[in-house]
Amino acid sequence: VKTVFLDTETTGFKPGNIVQLSYVIVGEQKESVARNFWFSVDYVEPEAERVHGMSVKVLRELSRGRVFADASDTVTHDLSNSLVVTHNVEFDRLFLETELQRCQRAWPARETFCTMQHFTPILQLPGNYGYKWPRLDELMRYLHVPAEDVQQRARQLFGTDAVGAHDARFDCTAVLECYQAAVAAGLPLPR
């Protein structure tokens, strides 16, 4: 089974649009393929723009006018019959399913795994009502995954120097690195 480590940047919290989709596919022979898509959208909520720094104008340039539908065949094929691993799977899957439904496509992955939910009882970070969901940087710290290593691996995988936090390329690589660190530490994870 191929494993797809994935992250999205979006127009906001409600299922609007995905503005950036990045993932790393790790095949059964441990070979890796990295993909990054930028999508042109009509509107980005101000709070979302503050987080990821992408305006409608910037996205139009980065995407060269492409929208999600232009990548839907590739995305469907890549996620088909896979294990999709994300940090907050409910959020990413909701946006992906919404975008795919607009293209008359069904969710193609076989199963999902959420590092955020899985590691909540392991990290035991205090919250207002029991343990809080760990942020990705908190999980990285717990698993001893330095941001510099993630940045270097993301640059290598995606072939660019322009990778930073709240960039889906960085975040999906961080999920990959955390997952691999957890496996190396002997923590039980799906494979």
Where in this protein do the model-derived segments appear?
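Conserved non-catalytic scaffold segment of RNase H-like nuclease domains
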Residues: 1-109, 138-145
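Residue-level "edge-of-site" marker
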Residues: 62, 113, 153
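Acidic, Mg2+-coordinating catalytic module of metal-dependent nucleases/exonucleases
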Residues: 80-90, 95-100, 129-191
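Short alpha-helix plus adjacent loop in nuclease-associated cores
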Residues: 113-131
